[in-house]
Amino acid sequence: MSEILLFSPQPLFSYTMNKYSRLYTNSNIRNTFFSEIGIGIAANSLLLLFHIFKFIRGQRSRLTDLPIGLLSLIHLLKLLMIAFIATDIFISWRGWDDIICKFLVYLYRSFRGLSLCTTCMLSVLQAITLSPRSSCLAKFKHKSPHHVSCAILSLSVLYMFISSHLLVSLIATPNLTTNVFMYVSESCSILPMSYLMQSMFSTLLAIRDVFLISLMVLSTCYMVALLCRHRKQTRHLQGTSLSPKASPEKKATHSILMLMSFFVLMSILDSIVSCSRTMFLYDPTSYAIQIFVSHIYATVSPFVFMSNEKHIVNFLRSLCKRVINV
């Protein structure tokens, strides 16, 4: 997905306060965005609490439970960060100093990278779970959550290093008119970087995205192939007239395949919106649309996971009935 909120190392456009100040005067854009963020925060909080209670009760966990719980935590923190940043875009506090700008934007960028990483890891772990005993991946099925935690921790350190340039280039917007700074929010701007630094961080980001997305595509194709083979074997043994009940592993796989497809769709849509911003000379409305599109995945993904959990589905149904009766 394209780097949202101008957090990429390339200077995408110059700082123009008057042009982007129109964002916080448009109540429709502001209300739509904060509604999306509110729904995403509530859904990710519910999914995270479910996995915390599941861990406390000592229930048997699947290999993918830790990444799913971690992904909900990452998306929750990511949405909280963008909510704070969005208040300075749509409401315009203009009271943040360098430390606040660096802290919020750096954390947001780190959570955004971890979201991609954890989604990829989730796809790989589900492929391992679904793999047959004869597969070379079967030996990884019984790995403890500590191995997954170590892998996630290592990637977290890597992403923090890749985003470290923001700690230097992010500043509080000075009270002067200039075309040197790049717009992040009403209070925060990015200093231009040298060509060497731009090239280095762009290369690191490109390598990261290509590697993770390629790994995600390979694991997804592997799961699809396994499901197709299993369906053929089932039809051969039981006949086409019967519809055997899907196992929990198969249901989880379908959910993750749906999530991967949705992730790719949102990535393509995000790229299209990003390109349209270039065509329309970085119109503020296109900028707001890109912010909205780039967070649809974090908002929708918990609903995909919760649809596979009977306890959460039953809880939501009972809650809806109570609301309707009231």
Swiss-Prot record:
Its main location: membrane. One of its GO terms (molecular function) is pheromone receptor activity. The chain crosses the membrane at residues 33-53, 66-86, 111-130, 151-171, 204-224, 255-275, 286-306. One of its GO terms (biological process) is response to pheromone. Residues 1-32, 87-110, 172-203, 276-285 are extracellular. Gene3D superfamilies: Rhodopsin 7-helix transmembrane proteins (1.20.1070.10). The keyword Glycoprotein applies. One of its GO terms (cellular component) is plasma membrane. It is found in: Cell membrane. Keywords: Cell membrane, Disulfide bond, G-protein coupled receptor, Glycoprotein, Membrane, Pheromone response, Receptor, Transducer, Transmembrane, Transmembrane helix. It comes from the Eukaryota. Residues 54-65, 131-150, 225-254, 307-326 are cytoplasmic. It is a multi-pass membrane protein. Disulfide bonds join C101-C188. Glycans are attached at N175. Belongs to the G-protein coupled receptor 1 family. Putative pheromone receptor implicated in the regulation of social as well as reproductive behavior. This is Vomeronasal type-1 receptor 94. The gene is Vom1r94.
